């Protein structure tokens, strides 16, 4: 998969209300740069990061409207000037009334 293809998939996921979730587990690590990763994730409303051995698991939360929260989780490792993405999981869920934007 090329960078542009992944960018289109993420765009369609955010724009298509019928697409509730997706999961990509790359057979070969998807290689990009720090700036490429920042471009793919855009501007999330909040983020959480944990490190598990060498792998980074980062959750990005987007408040698209009053009813829906969109979440992406990237599983990746860092090399010298490179990011190696192993898996991306995205889903949409109803926003709880008590859930405030952070």
UniProtKB/Swiss-Prot annotation:
A family per Pfam: DUF1374
Record-linked InterPro entries: SIFV_Orf14
Domain of life from the UniProt record: Viruses
Listed NCBIfam families: AcrID1_fam
Name of this protein: Uncharacterized protein 102
Upper taxonomic lineage: Viruses, Adnaviria, Zilligvirae, Taleaviricota, Tokiviricetes
């Amino acid at each position: 998969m090329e960078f542009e293809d992944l960018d289109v998939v993420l765009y369609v996921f955010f724009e298509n209300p019928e697409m509730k979730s997706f999961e990509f587990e790359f057979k070969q690590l998807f290689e990009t740069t720090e700036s490429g990763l920042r471009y793919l994730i855009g501007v999330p409303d909040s983020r959480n990061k944990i490190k598990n051995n060498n792998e980074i698991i980062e959750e990005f939360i987007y408040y698209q409207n009053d009813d829906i929260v969109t979440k992406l989780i990237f599983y990746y490792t860092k090399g010298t000037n490179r990011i190696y993405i192993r898996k991306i999981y995205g889903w949409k869920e109803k926003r709880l009334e008590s859930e405030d934007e952070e």
